[in-house]
Amino acid sequence: MSLPHDPHAWLEEVDGDAALAWVRERNAVTLAELEGAPAYAPLQARLAAILNARERIAHVAKHAAYFYNFWRDEDHVRGIWRRTTLAQYRLATPSWETVLDLDALARDEGENWVWAGARFLPLPAEAESDAEAKTDHCLLSFSRGGGDATVVREFDVTARAFVEGGFALPQAKSDVGWIDRDTLLVGTDTGPGSMTSSGYPRMVREWRRGTPLEHARIVYEAAEDDLSASAYKVFTPGHEMQFVQRQLSFYASELFLRQGDTLLKIDKPDSANAFTVRDQLVIELRADWETVGRTYPQGALLAIALARFLRGERDFAVLFAPSAARSLDAVAMTRSALLLTELDNVANRIVELTELDGAWSRRVVDAPALGSLGVAPVDRHGSDEYFLSVNDFLTPTSLYLGRAGTDERELLKALPALFDASRLTVSQQHAASRDGTPVPYFLVMDKDTLLDGSNPTLLYG
C-alpha cells in the first residue's frame, strides 16, 4: 500500500533552504506582533539578563576524586568541560581546571562541534587513589550542529588529550558503553544492514581495543523494523552483569541478561521498564500486569531477587503502588538505597527504600513538599550521597548534598532571589470539578490578603 502524498514533507529537511525560509517567514510574523507591544522591550531585556546571568548553578557529575561540569557562557559559546574537587565546589567561587575547551577544538578542527556528553569507565571497588589511573579514559561525544548523530572519541582526562589510536566512531546514531578499559559494547553504522529502518543501531558488537570494528563480535541483532538495539554493563561491585535491550518501539522493549554466549530473556511486559539494584530486579509498569494469579496496576514499581525471578518465582515486593492522586515521578539509586520521587496531589515527596534479604524498608525523607524536587546520585556504585535540587514559587533553585539514611543535608549552591518573597506565602488548596473530581492547586499571595472573594486572581495551568 502506498503512503498518501504529504505536501509538507519538505519541512522535514530541517537544514533545507526552503524549510529555513519558511521558518524565517513565520518568525517574522510573530516577532512583528511581539515587538509592537509596549511591554516587549523591558521584558526582553529582563529575561535576557536572567538567561545570561553568571549566577547559574554549575551542576556536576563525580568521577574518581573530581566533579565535572560542562559550562557555556558569553566567553565560551560552545562550552568548556572542566573539573574541580568537592572542597572547591563548596566555595562561592570554585577553582576550575579546564579539561577540554570546545570552542578551541572546533576552531582548530574547523568543525561545528556541539557537546553531547562524556562516559567514564566506572571506578573499580578499590580506593580511588589507586584506581584513578585505571579510569582516566572516557568516551566523549560531539555532534555537528546539534544533530542526533554523534562522533565518539576516546579522551584521557589526565593528559587532557584525545588518546592516539584510541576508540573512535565516525558520525552516526551510535550507542556505546564500557565493559572494561579495553572493551566496549557498541551499536553503530558499520554499513548495509547494521541500522534499523528507523536509523538506529540494529546490531550490538563487543569491540576489543586495537581491532577493526567491522570484525568485532556480534552480540545481538534486532529485526530491521525494530526501533533499535543496545547493550550495557552494570558495574555494581559484586553484582556485575551485562544486559541487551531490543527496543521494539518508543514504549516497548525486550530485555536480555547476557550470560557468556547466551542471552536469557527477562520475562517482563514489553511496555515495562526493568533494571537491577544489586541482586534485585526492579520492574516499573506502564500497564496492568497479571502474572501468577495476581494483577499489578499500571504505575506500580516491583522488586524481586533476580535469581528467584529467573527460577520462575513472581512474588514481588511492591515498592510503589499508584492511586488516583499518587504517581511515581522518578527513581534514583545510591549504593544502598532507592530514592523515589513521588507526586501526591501534585506535591513532591521523596521516599527512601532500603533492602535486606528481600525485605524492603520505607522512609519518607524530610524535604520541602510545595515545589519541585530533583534527586541525582553522586556515585551510584560507591556512595550513598546524592544531590537534591529544590525550588518552589518563592525559593530560588538550591542544590543540596544529602545522604541516604539521614535528613541532614548541606547547602552547596543557591541562585540569587530575583524578587522580595518575604511578604508572600504559598499554600495548596483543592477544588472540585463538576463531576466531583478533586483538583489540587497552589495559591501564591500576599500574607495579608483577605480571603473575601474579591481579589483579582491570575489563573493558569
Which residues fall in each region the model found?
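Conserved beta-propeller blade repeats
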Residues: A53-F70, E109-S141, A168-L185, A222-Q245, ...
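Hydrophobic or amphipathic alpha-helical targeting/insertion segments
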Residues: R83-L86, V151, D156-V163, L169-P192
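Zn2+-dependent metallopeptidase catalytic domains
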Residues: M1-N27, H59
